[in-house]
Structures are given as structure tokens and as C-alpha cells.
């Protein structure tokens, strides 16, 4: 059962997503359920992705960039590393998002309601 104090770990793997990330991050910040943490792993972007992510992390303490070396892992490897990090922090619930997603404001609150019924 999802407890009220359990944050949802949002896992975001990025690669050259500069044109998508501002809208994605804005949609996460606009969630009506504020109890979340965003873990991001960039897979060696050569555009402005890291600058956008760094600004988001400076602006909101719930946003964290996972620094895990320079090896390119692809999306599967990046999500695996993000899950490992989240589990090492005691995460019980995850939400995966792609860099080109835009979430509706109720996404996490509706997910939390559905999880309480399980």
C-alpha cells in the first residue's frame, strides 16, 4: 500500500533532449501532488540538455542529476542505473518518464489514488 509519506521517484533518462526538456520539467513541477523526487541521468548529451537540467536542479531541490561517469548506456541502461540509485535510497514507488513527455497535472495524484486500492 502506498503510504502518504512515500515520495514517488520519477526517473528520467535523457539524451540530446534540449528541445523537449523545458516542457517536460515544467509539467513535472506543475504536479498537484508535490511529494516526488526527480532523478535524472543524462547519457552524454551534446546539446543544452545538461544546462536545462542543472537549472532545474538549482531551482527545485526535488530535482537531482545522477552523475555516473561518461559511459553511454542507452535508455535501458540509464533507466536501470536510475532504478538502482532510487532503490538504494529506499524508494518504494517509481514513475518512468521520457524526455519528450508532458504530464498532465493530476498524473501523480491519480496514480497515488490507484495504488492505494492495491
Where are the model-predicted features located?
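Nucleotide-sugar donor-binding/catalytic module of glycosyltransferases
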Residues: 1-118
